[in-house]
Amino acid sequence: MVSKITLLCFAITCDVLISMGTVQGVFNHSVGPLAVCSPDMEDARAYTENCYRRCSRNKEPSTHGYVWLYSDTAPKGGPVVTRCNKVRVKQVFTETWSFSFIKGTPTRMTLDVTEAECVAVMRSQCPTHNCNIKAPSELPEEYHYASDTEVVQDYLEILSMPSGLDYMEENLRITPSQSKFSFQLTDGKGQEGQYIYFWDTKYDDTKCPFDSFQSHGCDKYDSPLDLINCRESRFVIPSIANSTTLVGACQGLQKSTTGLIYKWDDRPDSIANDSKRIALTKNDQTAGNVATLRVLVADSLNAVDEDLCHTQCEMLDFILRSDRKREVLTRIGGSYLVVSKTSYIRQCRPLVGCRIVKPHYFCGNPNRVAIICHGKVWYWDPLKSYVDEGMNCERRVAGTKLVFAVGNHEYAIDDDMHVELPEHETYGISHDLLASSEDRISKDIVDPTELRNSWQSHIAKEGRMSIEPLSQDKQVSHWDAEFSNPLTWLTSAGGWILDMSHKVTLWATVFLTLGALVAGAKVWEIMRKANRKSQYKRTNTEPHDSQATWI
């Protein structure tokens, strides 16, 4: 079956054409990330043991009401930010005795950079701040016989990227892509570790970019649990005391510790079933003769909840014991986790209402596309169901493609907009934990041809990019043989003479050794033949008297 792909923001819409017949149809498939995950590894055993202890909770909530969830409706977030940093790239090239070549994997290390260095390069190479200057993904190859050659080059990288907006203070703050820090919009520049950011302070947007798209009936538990537990998908807002209240244009909204933008609508006296999670909170109309039944049903639901929670903990234990070839995203209660191949875990936070940033931005190694989720910009690898925090934005590695995972299949934007799918495979609409068919979340259609053209333009632009290293060095480590080198006096004439010295000496040694072995074998064979002849004796036979003589 051949399917033509059309991308929805984060759904795939396919016009299905079965090649063996005339049946046509359309299906949608969600391909967006569900969570953003920390790079920090944690002990999975300790987390699993804690998992069971976290399954118990209070039977009665403190109050109940509605949680309104908000999604970012801004087309591109905040202003374009130009990031500057210095990087040192190392790569080892090996030539063996048998003239084979081994190319090592490049390694990157971020160095300190000054504002003056960044400004000088931006003025000369990208004065409009539309910059895409990146260190090469691989260094020029350099080989020396029977040696390891470590090539080291330093580069200044300047990259333009989108940003998100924060409304946690009266003055707007911006958060650059993949950054954990926010900066005052009016500052025009900021520094995070070894990265320096620049942006235009004239950006002005007085409208709040967040719009409500869902409401959920929830139960609120005060300290020590300090959380909101909602119906539908069992999503949880933890540590509500630590939520941040937004101000300015977004006054009244709150941002949870996991990044969700929400508004709490307290309804303690509501008898509507959808205004709470378990609909068992006591009120005047349900008091009296139904009090006992209320308590019994609450106990039963609490037992069911604890059983489900323990089952999820057991599933996590099974995943940790299984043989995994890749990292696995799983959900335990209201939390997402990535389980590594080595049985460590990384904690994740849910993402809601993600959209592709326009104009499109891309990164390489691995290939990623920029997305915006509740006010923050991330670079997402479409082969994964989650976003990795804190990754560098490097050049694309030659020959690689931008690949989306479509169910159990992979679709490369670089290809001809068609993908082979099994004829009898069933497809449906896949959502994240908060999506429903009635929600008002934005699903802007993304033309796959437009995305493909942007990706190919990005590849062509990087192909034309010319960047000179700030400094370069190399270190050649020769594989010295265990004998005195009679030609070492030639090393002063230059490195190429030293290479020739090694080649001549090593191969002369090899041939001399082989010659000695052959000569030794010949001498041994001659000695063995001589010894064999000395063991033979000549015997003269005289005729006997009884012999007859014929006449």
UniProtKB/Swiss-Prot annotation:
A cellular component annotation (GO) from this entry: viral envelope
Main location: virion
GO BP terms, alphabetized: symbiont entry into host cell; virion attachment to host cell
Transmembrane segments: 504-524
UniProt entry tagged with the keyword Membrane: yes
Virion surface side: 26-503
Keyword terms: Glycoprotein, Host-virus interaction, Membrane, Signal, Transmembrane, Transmembrane helix, Viral attachment to host cell, Viral envelope protein, Virion, Virus entry into host cell
Subcellular location: Virion membrane
Cysteines joined through disulfide linkages: none
Modification(s) after translation: Glycosylated by host. Glycosylation is crucial for glycoprotein export at the cell surface.
UniProt record similarity statement: Belongs to the cytorhabdovirus glycoprotein family.
Subunit structure of this chain's protein: Homotrimer. Interacts with matrix protein.
Protein's recorded name: Glycoprotein
Gene that specifies this protein: G
